[in-house]
């Protein structure tokens, strides 16, 4: 009798103690963060992206996600905007879309 009780308590404790996956940290605040970028690349210290990040005093190591260049906001309301390049959801937008960081590709089926 005691063995069954202890086994049940031990299994219940184990089930509660098992870690779960954390919620995703990169969530899109659509439609506010949806953008159409002419170029989307991994952050690097070299080339145009490295130069722009350096001018903004942003360390490549601090960036999670991709970097978008020449991005324009996409409005889901009204249907006037369409994206012929890469649709992304970006966390930060600098200089009116010249460079956006923390971008995640989005697939929009119309």
Swiss-Prot record:
Q: Where does the UniProt entry say this protein principally localizes? A: secreted
Task: Give the protein's recorded name.
Answer: Class I hydrophobin 2
Quaternary structure annotation from Swiss-Prot or TrEMBL: Self-assembles to form functional amyloid fibrils called rodlets. Self-assembly into fibrillar rodlets occurs spontaneously at hydrophobic:hydrophilic interfaces and the rodlets further associate laterally to form amphipathic monolayers.
Question: GO: which molecular function terms?
Answer: structural constituent of cell wall
Keyword Translocase appears in the UniProt entry? no
- Species this protein is from: Coprinopsis cinerea
**Which residues form each disulfide bond in the chain?**
28-89, 36-83, 37-71, 90-103
Looking at the record's lineage, which domain of life comes first?
Answer: Eukaryota
Identify the stretch annotated as signal peptide in this record: 1-17
- Listed Pfam families: Hydrophobin
Per the record, what is one GO cellular component? Answer: extracellular region
Annotated compartments:
Secreted; Secreted, Cell wall
TM spans (from-to): none
Q: Does the keyword Glycoprotein apply?
A: yes
């Amino acid at each position: 009798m005691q063995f069954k009780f202890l086994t049940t308590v031990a299994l219940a404790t184990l089930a509660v103690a098992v870690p779960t996956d954390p919620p995703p940290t990169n969530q899109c605040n659509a439609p506010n963060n949806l953008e159409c970028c002419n170029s989307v690349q991994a952050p690097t210290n070299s080339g145009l992206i490295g130069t722009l990040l350096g001018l903004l005093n942003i360390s490549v190591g601090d960036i999670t996600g991709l970097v978008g260049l020449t991005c324009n906001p996409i409005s889901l309301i009204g249907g006037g905007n369409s994206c012929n390049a890469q649709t992304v959801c970006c966390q930060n937008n600098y200089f009116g879309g010249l460079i956006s960081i923390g971008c995640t590709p989005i697939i929009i089926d119309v």
